[in-house]
Every structure is written in structure tokens, then in C-alpha cells.
């Protein structure tokens, strides 16, 4: 998992507030987009339209959501909590 506190390069590249896109990959379950949005709404409330794309074999889906990030801490906590969803395999 990405540790943004130790990754000064990412912190230096971002100027807050800014748009930040998360790409969450997980099992192809109908609840995946809803669960991703639940976590995002806790830390960055807003009206989001997730983009869902199936994998070639259909076993996995990727859910992309762009938020209005206000701090590096917000970005990091979302990476952590999105990665803790049991049906999620990777967060980019």
C-alpha cells in the first residue's frame, strides 16, 4: 500500500485543494461501487458518479472516482480505508 507520509514526491506534486482520482479494483460484486462511495462520503462528502469498468474475464471491476481533495492526510486515509474493504484487491 502507498504510504504518502514517506513519499515526499507525491506530496510535492500535489497542491491542495485539487482533484484526485482513486481507482479501486475489486471482485465483480454489485455492491463494490456502493461500498467505495460509502468510504469516500465519510471523508470527502459530495455528489460522485463512479465509473465502473469490468476486467477482460469479468471477474473483477475497477471503480474510478474523482474527489476534491483538501489535504494529503485526506488522500492517505482514503487509500487506507478503501484498501480495507474486504472485496477490494488494490487501490491506485
Curated annotation (Swiss-Prot):
- Coiled-coil stretches noted in the UniProt entry, renumbered to this chain: none
As for family, the record states: Belongs to the UPF0250 family.
- Pfam families in alphabetical order: DUF493
Name this protein carries in UniProt: UPF0250 protein VC_0945
Top-rank taxon, per record:
Bacteria
Native organism is Vibrio cholerae serotype O1 (strain ATCC 39315 / El Tor Inaba N16961)
Q: Which GO terms describe its cellular component?
A: cytosol
Amino acid at each position: 500500500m502507498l504510504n504518502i507520509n514517506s513519499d515526499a514526491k507525491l506530496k510535492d506534486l500535489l497542491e491542495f485543494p485539487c482533484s484526485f482520482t482513486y481507482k479501486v479494483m475489486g471482485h465483480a460484486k454489485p455492491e463494490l461501487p456502493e461500498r467505495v462511495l460509502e468510504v469516500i462520503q465519510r471523508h470527502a462528502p459530495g455528489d460522485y458518479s463512479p465509473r465502473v469498468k469490468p476486467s477482460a474475464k469479468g471477474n473483477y471491476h475497477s471503480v474510478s472516482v474523482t474527489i476534491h481533495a483538501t489535504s494529503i492526510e485526506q488522500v492517505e486515509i482514503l487509500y487506507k480505508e478503501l484498501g480495507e474493504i474486504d472485496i477490494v484487491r488494490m487501490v491506485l
